[in-house]
Design a protein with these regions (language model features):
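Class I S-adenosyl-L-methionine
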Residues: 2-253
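FAD-binding beta-loop-beta segment adjacent to the flavin cofactor pocket
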Residues: 270-280, 290-330
Length: 359
């Protein structure tokens, strides 16, 4: 069996004031009498198998006891794999005998911490970038730059070509009826929203955290968080979108404050994507992020979010694009479908690993 969950499952919760760990409790449940699975627990990331998104995930593999012992006895596992399998077998046997093990944080193996098990068969499939040639971490730009304009597709990146080869029965690089892939309806926004998105783009480029924090604080509470001279100096060379649709710069505190006043918001979760980095994890709501391109002051389409996760373009999402209120009890909109999905490249890597175990 395989269980997939978000990284949050690794964090503790309190029961009667004492820390408990959901992932460890689930592993114990699978190892208990009547269930009889030997667990191997992993913490992996979709970007390590080629997806253009930083998407860490907890994976638990549950092996039927006979299969587990057969794999352990065959001699194919490396030193770290043998160590992990022996540790899991002892964990399983203790639970079967009624000896409940104490919490052990080392019972899951973390790719983010470069655990050496991911250099060995078959776990190395979860740390194998599919790009040919030099190792390459896929970026936001790799994933969506060719479909940024409503006028049609430009030259796709190697990343896009790769994900469109994932399922030959679904995908070709032939032109679509509209010139653009499905689920790629660009959203329209008013002047103030566009101006705010341009502000987020500027903020995303600033490496100086105190400057960014000053700007965020001012937008949230201008009375108690005035603009500093350093902020004005830092932003003076940047171009902002004014309410009349033109781009302009601000060299004085007074003009910058006047421009920022309509931008004030208590919503602090929105941000602009960074073109040369993988997309962030939290992308499941249409308003989570805006485009990185100065000419594309808008939120992301369903297709763009799907591209980050490595979904081929011919994989079409159905249902409503968005929904809300009571209807969320009955409907799963397209943005939620993408946000809750397992990236195909990660699914493929996990499947390959399981196939190797079974063979």
């Amino acid at each position: 069996v395989m269980l997939e969950n978000v990284t949050g499952i690794l964090r503790a919760f309190k029961v009667d004031g004492k820390p408990r760990y959901a992932w460890f409790e689930v592993a114990k449940a699978f190892a208990s009498i009547g269930c009889d699975y030997v667990p191997i627990c992993l913490h992996v990331n979709a970007r390590n198998v080629g997806a253009a998104q930083n998407r860490p995930r907890y994976i638990m593999l549950g092996f039927e006891k006979k299969l587990f012992k057969r794999i352990l006895s065959k001699g194919s596992l490396g030193a770290e794999g043998k160590k992990a399998f022996n540790k899991s077998l002892k964990f399983f046997e203790n639970i079967q005998q009624g000896n409940v093990p104490s919490y052990d944080a080392s019972f899951y193996y973390d790719l983010a911490k470069s655990h050496p098990i991911f250099n060995e068969w078959p776990f190395k499939d979860l740390n194998k970038n599919p790009f040919e040639g030099e190792p390459h971490i896929a970026t936001v730009s790799d994933a969506i730059h060719d479909i940024r304009s409503p006028e049609g597709i430009s030259q796709p990146s190697d990343y896009v070509k790769m994900i469109n080869r994932l399922s030959p029965s679904l995908n070709t690089l032939s032109k679509y009826e509209s010139g653009l892939p499905p689920n790629h309806k660009l959203r329209a926004h008013g002047a103030r929203v566009k101006a705010r998105f341009r502000l987020y783009q500027v903020m995303a480029k600033i490496a100086n955290k105190p400057i960014v924090n000053n700007l965020k604080s001012y937008l949230k509470d201008p009375v108690n968080n005035p603009i500093t001279d350093d902020l004005v100096s830092h932003l003076s060379s940047e171009q902002f979108l004014s309410m009349d649709g033109g781009f302009r710069s601000f060299s004085s505190k007074e003009t910058l404050e006047k421009f920022l006043t309509p931008m004030q918001t208590k919503k602090q979760t929105q941000r602009a994507l960074v073109a040369d980095s993988p997309a962030p994890t939290a992308l499941s709501i249409a308003d989570d992020a805006c485009h990185y391109d100065k000419e594309q002051l808008r939120t992301l389409t369903v297709r763009e979010m799907a591209r980050f996760q490595s979904f081929p373009d011919k994989f079409e999402f159905r249902s409503k694009v968005t929904t809300g209120g009571r209807m969320r009890q009955f409907e799963v909109p397209q943005y939620t479908q993408v946000g809750n999905a397992v990236p195909p490249l990660l699914g493929k890597a996990l499947g390959k690993m399981c196939k190797e175990f079974l063979s």
